[in-house]
Amino acid sequence: MLYKFSDAELMLAPDGSIYHLRLHPEQLTDTVLLVGDPARVALVGEHLTRVEPLADNREFRSLRGWRGDTPITVLSTGIGAGCIDIVINELDILANIDLRLRRPNFSTRSLRLIRLGTSGAL
């Protein structure tokens, strides 16, 4: 039997999205561009087609767009290692946990995370 995460272990927003990023698993693409400043999300989005804003909560702003045949998520991390830690953990949760059932997915998903900016490279 798969482990079931408690409310304290897996915090969700009232709409069922992940707590800080306010994203749902189906909104996440395999390639994620990470920028620090939320204003840079729109700047990166100018280089994509079919751009769709996804969420905007605190320092975490996101959109989804396309570069050729590749869907891409652009997401701001805010300032500092603490915020980056939240982003990386919540992206992993979106990719590998069924939020409705609060259980790990049967298969794992790897994401391609690319950091764009002046510092904070992973």
What is each PLM-predicted segment?
Residues 2-122:
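Metabolite-binding pocket within alpha/beta catalytic cores that recognizes anionic/polar moieties
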